[in-house]
C-alpha cells in the first residue's frame, strides 16, 4: 500500500487529471496494513483534494455509493453492479435502491444487453452466472 501511495504523489506531479482506484471491496480495510480505514479514505487523504478520486469495488446500492463518497471519493465507478443492471445509474435517485446481486441467470444478463460471448466469459467469475 505504501508503494501505491508514493506512486500517487508521482502521478499527481506528472499532471494526471484524476486517479481511479479499484478496491475490489470499498467496505473492507486493506489487508497487511495497520490502518483500519478503507482504501478510499487512505487515498483521499494522500490526494488532499489535489485532483478527483474515482473509486470502485462492490458498490451495489445507492446507500453504498453515498458511503464511498463519504469516504472521500469524488466519483463512484461500478462494474459488477452495472454488468447485472444496465440501468443501475438511473436508480441512484432512489435512496432505497438495492438491486439483485449475483448469481444472475444467463437469460437475465442477455436481457441486460450482454453478448453471449461476454456471458460465457462471466461464467468464469465464481458465483456470477448460474
Where are the regions that the model predicts?
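Flavin-dependent oxidoreductase catalytic cores
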Residues: 1-130
Amino acid at each position: 500500500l505504501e508503494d501505491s501511495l508514493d506512486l500517487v504523489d508521482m502521478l499527481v506531479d506528472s499532471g494526471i487529471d484524476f486517479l481511479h482506484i479499484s478496491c475490489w471491496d470499498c467496505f473492507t480495510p486493506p489487508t497487511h496494513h495497520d490502518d483500519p480505514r478503507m482504501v478510499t479514505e487512505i487515498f483521499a487523504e494522500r490526494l488532499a483534494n489535489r485532483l478527483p478520486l474515482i473509486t470502485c469495488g462492490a458498490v451495489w446500492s445507492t446507500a453504498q455509493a453515498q458511503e464511498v463518497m463519504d469516504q472521500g471519493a469524488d466519483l463512484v465507478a461500478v462494474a459488477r453492479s452495472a454488468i447485472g443492471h444496465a440501468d443501475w445509474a438511473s436508480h441512484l435517485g432512489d435512496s432505497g435502491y438495492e438491486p439483485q446481486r449475483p448469481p444472475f441467470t444467463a437469460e437475465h444478463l442477455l436481457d441486460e444487453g450482454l453478448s453471449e460471448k461476454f456471458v460465457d466469459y462471466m461464467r468464469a467469475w465464481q458465483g456470477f452466472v448460474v
